[in-house]
Amino acid sequence: MIRRLACAAALLALAACGGDGEYGRTSFVAAGDIASGCWRGDEATARLLDDIDAPVVATLGDNVYPSGTDREFRQCYDRSWGRFLDRTRPSVGNHEYKTKDASGYFNYFGERAGPRGKGWYSYDHEGWHLVVLNSDEPLDRGTEQHQWLVRDLERNRGTKCTLAYFHHPRWSSGKHGGKERVLDAYRALYDGGADVLLTGHDHHYERFAPLDPVGRVDPERGIRTFVVGTGGAPSYRMRATEPHSEALGDDVRGVLRMVFHPDRYEWEFVAIPGRRFHDEGRGECH
């Protein structure tokens, strides 16, 4: 059931971009919570990726269920999203850690997953800086990962637009809700000038207004956060809608496509056929 639809005047801009794929030029596409055993939602979202034809496919954790084993990656993930492996930039989720040290994840993605046993890394794409974190490893201030994040953001201060992604959301109206465990990382991203944050974990789609680390609307410096746990796994029941949630779709599967510009971005949530939920819009970098 669709709880709320958000309308924005970006459809014409997205359609006018031109370029590759049925959807016009696309810079980047993302979703998490993907391949779930005999459930075939991941095959439906993979067909969307065929049509969108983005140069970067980002995963937002929980790539395969239930335990992220080598066998599950081969037999489940690989048959659907695996065909985009050469352009995938993954992040790891809690279900991968049901296998010791998330070994199935690191074995499957190899160097694409960042340093083995860590899983955090960054890269540049179309003039944007993208930061991938491991929210199953400590992110508190002073930890190895947090220190790396602060240094990485400082080194890339000259980049106008920054996007980060990891598995556990800072805010969510879904079953699991927002996680305090990522607060220090969110604060570092905010201080470092990040513009967009993508997460998964809860199996729905949600978009929040640009917020500061304690959840206040901040149009000037706030990070626009998305929950995109819609890669194929079964949906969860929703809780009460969190403050400043601007778009919310449950019982929906699909992917978030983005178009990057030097100082701004456009987004569009594309649902699988038969699901009528849609969200799109645009934002400016800080």
Walk through the language-model features, giving the residues of each.
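Structural motif
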Residues: 28-30, 58, 130-132, 163-165, ...
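Short hydrophobic/aromatic-rich beta-strand segments that constitute the beta-sheet cores
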Residues: 132, 265-269
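Hydrophobic h-region of N-terminal signal peptides that target proteins for export
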Residues: 10-18
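Bacterial N-terminal signal peptides that target proteins for export
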Residues: 1-6
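Active-site flanking residues adjacent to catalytic metal/cofactor-binding acidic residues
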Residues: 32-33, 61-62, 93, 166, ...
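Short, solvent-exposed aromatic-acidic interface loops
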Residues: 268-278
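Extended active-site neighborhood of metal-dependent phosphoesterases/phosphodiesterases
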Residues: 50, 66, 70-162, 176-191, ...
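N-terminal active-site segment of His-dependent metallophosphoesterases
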Residues: 17-75, 139, 144, 151, ...
